[in-house]
């Protein structure tokens, strides 16, 4: 098995088929909806809040609301009352099962439910998928996070409509340092490995450091990527604003950090400061334009044409052409 990550792979151009990059279609379908770009902000308290989620839904983007200190039933009701789709996160603890029962009792079905735990290849995830599929059968279920083909196969067999691949590669995640496990340093290889067996969409979660990494994720089998650091640090970001001299930053921390947990227990995340980048909308438009350029370099017109290109693995004098 080849081991590589985003920083030591480059994609190879093919003959361009468009006159303008603006002709290239970056949209992707997930469930019953299409979205402008294959990018979803990480479901973290310092990346998304209710206002950002509503704006994204109204402007053609996919979102997943975080699951911390939130009344999910009220959130779903409010989003759907606005004419927006509802996309929520759940864990696998008794309160999460209670939320499913409350939604079913009130005949409210969120369009998307993400089962979001650090080690998603677990009996508890199988139980939660089964509960959701039984009580809220119309919901599109995303389950994760996982790191192996075996896990993807199991989650699909258990009923997941999509899987989230990535254990610990994020900028504020320290899972590999604390536990010795994860996909940090080889996330792109893990994605390729998992995509070979997947029959449903994969969301690559973590390790994205530049817009070009989004195109690389699509090439190696992702339908969408979940991005934290690149979409934190905006004017609208819910993280606390910190000023140091003449510079302004936004607080950004992992869901398994003590800053999110409120206690130092089973910590696998840390806190950093992200320079404020300006409005979120500007970054999303730039991502779309950069993906259009990627599609044009791939010799295509649609997003998935990126999957047709060859690539090189960089390694000093020993670059490998694939």
Swiss-Prot record:
Top-level taxon in the UniProt lineage: Bacteria
Keywords assigned: NADP, Oxidoreductase
NCBIfam families in the cross-refs: GMP_reduct_2, PRK05458.1
Entry keyword Oxidoreductase: yes
Gene3D superfamilies per record: Aldolase class I
Gene encoding the protein: guaC
Protein name: GMP reductase
Keyword presence, Oxidoreductase: yes
The protein's Enzyme Commission number: 1.7.1.7
């Amino acid at each position: 098995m080849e081991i590589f990550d985003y920083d030591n792979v480059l994609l190879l151009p093919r003959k361009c088929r468009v006159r303008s990059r603006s002709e290239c279609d970056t949209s992707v379908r997930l469930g019953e909806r299409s979205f402008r770009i294959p990018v979803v902000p990480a479901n973290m308290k310092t990346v998304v809040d209710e206002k950002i989620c509503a704006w994204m839904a109204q402007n053609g983007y996919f979102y997943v609301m975080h699951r911390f200190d939130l009344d999910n039933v009220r959130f779903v009701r409010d989003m759907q009352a606005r004419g927006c789709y509802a996309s929520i996160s759940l864990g696998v603890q008794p309160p999460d099962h209670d939320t499913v029962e409350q939604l079913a009792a009130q005949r409210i079905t969120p369009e998307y439910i993400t089962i979001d735990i650090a080690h998603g290849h677990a009996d508890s995830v199988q139980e939660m998928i089964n509960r959701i599929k039984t009580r809220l059968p119309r919901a599109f279920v995303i389950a994760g996070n996982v790191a192996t083909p075996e896990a993807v196969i199991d989650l699909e067999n258990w009923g997941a409509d999509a899987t989230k691949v990535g254990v610990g590669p994020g900028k504020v995640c320290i899972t590999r340092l604390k536990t010795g496990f994860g996909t940090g340093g080889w996330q792109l290889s893990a994605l390729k490995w998992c995509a070979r067996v997947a029959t449903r969409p994969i969301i690559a979660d973590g390790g994205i450091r530049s817009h070009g990494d989004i195109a690389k994720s699509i090439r190696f089998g992702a339908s969408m990527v979940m991005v934290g650091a690149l979409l934190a640090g905006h004017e609208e970001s819910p993280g606390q604003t910190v000023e140091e001299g003449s510079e302004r930053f936004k607080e950004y921390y992992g869901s398994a950090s003590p800053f999110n947990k409120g206690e130092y227990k089973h910590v696998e995340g840390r806190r950093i400061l992200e320079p404020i980048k300006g409005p979120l909308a500007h970054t999303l438009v730039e991502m779309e334009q950069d993906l259009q350029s990627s599609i044009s370099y791939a010799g295509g017109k649609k997003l998935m044409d990126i999957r047709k290109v060859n690539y090189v693995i960089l390694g000093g004098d020993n670059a490998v052409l694939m």
